Amino acid sequence: RLDYSGHGRSSEAFTDGCIGDWAADAQAVITAVTDGSVVLVGSSMGGWISCLLSQRLPRVAGFVGIAAAPDFTEDGMWASFDDAQRKTLWDEGVLMLPSDYDAPYAVTRKIIEDGRNHLVLRAPLPMNFPVRLLQGSDDVDVLPQVAVALLNHIEGGDVRMVLVKGADHRFSSPDCLTLLERTVAEVAQIK
């Protein structure tokens, strides 16, 4: 498990990070602590990071995305901001947004600008290994349509999506966790 800077138990501030930094962090950890083939497993933003790493690391042998959120800074955040929010973000460098899970969170100009340098749905995305996308039907943070768009965009011969009725963004019910465990084991066994 990896907590990106500004996430989980890491010591850095979220507002100091961006997609490029987090992808570089993940790549450095994978390079330092693994040998041989790797299966990338990423949830939400981690799904986007996994898409990026799948193009950078030749050792990737599979990808399991859970509510994967590719290009969310552009297609989810920026696209949903009204003119006043965009102006605040650009002028002040930060925009505070409410969260359904926690205290309000900051969206920085840095994350929006950097995200534009790492978009994966606007160029070919070859994945010549097993890909499994797990998605909840009740996810309001990453809508099922995002998973379908990613499914259709990935170029590969073994790309599948499972939509779980009633599952939300956290995808953490006992049934969801069992499905996740089974899916990772399946992808890891495919050669």
Question: Where does each model-flagged region fall?
Answer:
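Gly/Ala-rich beta-loop-alpha elbow adjacent to hydrolase catalytic centers
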Residues: G42-G46, S50
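Catalytic histidine neighborhood in serine/cysteine hydrolases
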Residues: I154-R170
